[in-house]
Regions:
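Single conserved hydrophobic/aromatic residue that forms the stacking wall/gate
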Residues: 1-13
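Residues within membrane-spanning alpha-helices of integral membrane proteins
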Residues: 8, 66, 73-76, 96, ...
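Aromatic-anchored segments of alpha-helical transmembrane domains
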Residues: 32-33, 99-108, 171-183
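Membrane-embedded catalytic cores of phosphoryl/pyrophosphoryl-handling enzymes
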Residues: 128-213
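N-terminal transmembrane-helix/juxtamembrane module of multi-pass inner/ER membrane proteins
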Residues: 10, 14-74, 111, 118-128, ...
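Hydrophobic, lipid-facing residues on alpha-helical transmembrane segments of integral membrane proteins
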Residues: 22-37, 92, 96, 100-104, ...
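Alpha-helical transmembrane segments of integral membrane proteins
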Residues: 19-27, 68, 89-97, 165-169, ...
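Membrane-interface loops
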Residues: 39-54, 81-165
């Protein structure tokens, strides 16, 4: 029976991962089209705004925080192992809402990054050059990096009951928010507005979708 039970559990996980992958594929395509499309548009505009304060430019550049910044990719995988299908669908809807709201704000309020991007980052150059190639510094307010982090952490926090895991999720979220500042990808307003967007999509889209199921 143990072998049969293990095999059945393995099949359930496989089906769950495949289901998540089928959700993630079109979402990733939609993200690429919307995010890079709006960035392309705003990079060609001349009415971009300075949405930061001068003191923020004194925030230190900490290259090693790029690992924490990139840990969002790990966070994105966790729902496949912890959420039900109805929860995954609700999460996908929440992400779409966050993406379109952010895109509308990017077009209405295009911004310029105040930090000067370095030409060379010793020890991390390849990683940062790849990041700079993907992200033109105009889709700033709100930070989708932060909004996505906040949304996923809120959803996982709700679904997992362990006090230690919940505490770890909160710490992870704090470090993710700090990382976008310390690798000079965003400013303070971007982080605050990203947190607000993530929370609103969690409360108004995810929670309502779950309550209807």
């Amino acid at each position: 029976y143990t072998g049969t039970t293990s095999s059945a559990a393995s099949d359930v996980y496989k089906r769950q991962i495949l289901f998540y992958a089928r959700l993630a594929a079109p979402l990733s395509l939609l993200f690429a089209v919307i995010y890079f499309g709006t960035n392309w548009i705003t990079s060609r505009r001349t009415d971009n705004h300075q949405l930061y304060l001068e003191w923020e430019l004194a925030i230190p550049f900490v290259p090693s925080m790029i690992y924490m910044y990139a840990s969002l990719l790990v966070l994105l995988l966790l729902p496949a192992f912890t959420l039900t299908r109805s929860q995954l669908i609700a999460l996908a809807r929440s992400l779409v809402a966050a993406l379109f709201i952010a895109a509308a704000i990017y077009l209405l309020l295009p911004a310029d990054l105040g930090f000067v991007r370095p030409d060379h980052v010793p020890g991390y150059n390849a990683v940062f050059q790849a990041l700079f190639a993907l992200e033109m510094p105009h889709n700033l307010v709100p930070s989708l990096h932060v909004a996505t982090s906040a949304l996923f952490i809120a959803v996982l926090y709700r679904s997992l009951s362990s006090v230690w895991i919940r505490a770890g999720l909160i710490l992870w979220g704090v470090l993710l928010c700090a990382s976008v500042l310390l690798v000079h990808q965003h400013h303070v307003l971007d982080v605050v507005s990203g947190l607000l967007l993530g929370y609103l999509c969690y409360r108004l889209v995810y929670r309502r979708a779950i309550e209807r199921t």
